[in-house]
Amino acid sequence: MDELTKKVLNSFAHWRKETLDLHELFEAGGNDPDARTAVFDIVERLVKEGLLAEEGNDFYSLTDKGKAAAKEV
């Protein structure tokens, strides 16, 4: 698992929230526009892989599978 994906998964623990909006998840990429674009792609991939759940209005939460993966990183 790449470092940016780990940062995205760990964002929930960092912010101490069950649900994060896309802008909070972008923080994993810092101020680098390319990294923020990569975060968007990672979020889409994690949804497809079942690690994140879309909650509507650009909000996301960790699924049980995502919580397990976050504990491993």
Predicted regions and their residues:
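Minor-groove-contacting beta-hairpin "wing" of winged helix-turn-helix DNA-binding domains
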Residues: 58-64
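Short, amphipathic alpha-helical interaction segments positioned at domain boundaries
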Residues: 67-73
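Short amphipathic alpha-helical interaction segments
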Residues: 32-48
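Short, intrinsically disordered, low-complexity terminal segments
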Residues: 32, 66-67
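Short amphipathic alpha-helical interface segments
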Residues: 1-31
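A short, conserved structural fragment
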Residues: 47-57
